[in-house]
Amino acid sequence: MREHEREYPRDDAFEALLAQSVDELPPEEIVADVTPWRRAMERVLFGLALCMVTLNFWCLNYLLPAIGTVLLLLGFRALRRENPWLRGCFVCAVLRAACVFPSLILNTTILPGDACRSAAAAVSAALMLALLLCFWQGLRAVRRKAGLPAQGGGAGALLAWYVLMCVLAAVHYTGLLVPIAMLVGYVCILRSLFRLSRALDEAGYAIAPQPVRVTDRALALVLAAALGIGCTLGYLFGGSYRMDWQPADISEQTQTAAIRQQLLDLGFPEAVLNDLTPEDIAACDGAVRVVAVTEDHPFNDGRTVSHKESDGEGGVVSVLDTVYDVRELRLTSVGVQLPGAQETWRVYHHFLWTTDPGFYGTEALQIWPADQSTPDGWRFAGDVTGRVLHDRDGQTFTAPYHALGRQTYTADSVFFGQRTNSDLFAPFSMPRHAEHARGYVAYTAAAVQSDCLLSSWCNYTHQQSLLQYPAVTAMEKRMTSAFGNAGAFYTVQHALQFFPEDAQTLR
């Protein structure tokens, strides 16, 4: 008896110690771990919120839906065995991930066109509609299983909301009132769904965790790694055109030696003449006059210098100027008057990189020909010709442009509004460290009436960085941007302008 009496205090001490150990509730993350339903539903609802909200800055319109896609995948992965409808949600989430992630990777390349992007967006929207329909019916089945009324009003409202948003996008709705009302409704719907999830949790509804070979963390890391590797490969290998570079035939120059000498005597720049094809040289046979203008353009920030100047009132002021020690791009424009009763000029726009700027993807020449600047004075006559060249280890290589001709597009300008343009474009790519990268575009302008200014413009767009998302070409950027520095691209402008009667350039 005494031994048992001595054990009672020990038992009391153990019970007291046990009570002290459970005085506090476990941390929230522990609670979430033991309530898989709550964790899965939170992932689903946050995933839906991120997938349906578009913030068009800092690439959030791509980043947030990508995170939302992963959350939907993980959330429905845990719920897929609850009923056939939630299993359908998981299938839709997998298919959407298979659509969204390749699209994100392809956005680092210039491969997908507008039609491809539109098709991917349509497939993604259709899968989201199917997912929301399954989610609505899946929640109704869950409520019935939990002994609650079979209602899924919040999910049904979300389905109707998404259908209406698709309709507004299809008709290109531009008003402000309806989107604000839709945003308010969206917030209310999400609150309703969170309350529904909490009500099921409080009613004691639970799901049994299923053993999986790949944890959620591992799956998310694999998706992130695949996305990172895919985007890196896209930037490195998918950002430039495939050019047909061939060694230049030096013997071509001897075929037009007499015409070459005639053009040189008239003042045709020899550096430009050396890059012309025999056909473009022969087109100038019997030339009457040559007009040429050359400008060097910087593609660097230069350096700032200060100097003193008079203010005109006896005082002195300090003036800051930017000085460019290096001007990397040389643009030369040449006009050659051809023989004949009708005044006709052959116009050449030539570029030469005097130093290696580093080529990161695509380049583009945009030409505003004389008939576009002065339609009453000039007409376009003949085809557009040209090529690009570069040197490597003492050997010259040539290639045709990726495309050469008129491109019709719609531009939106602050000053002129939305209008349709049709310009000459010559897009191309150069090897990463091409030497003496150069090229030209040529066309013929015939006079409609005499004494009209011949004004021909050349805009050169250079890609100065790999980092842009989504990736666009220099030509696409030129169609939508102004001159100067525009993110990964920089555009400079050059013109050949003169009155044919005196052949004196205006600049």
Question: Model segments located where?
Answer:
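Membrane-interface extramembranous regions at the lipid-water interface
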Residues: 2-58, 63-108, 129-168, 183-220
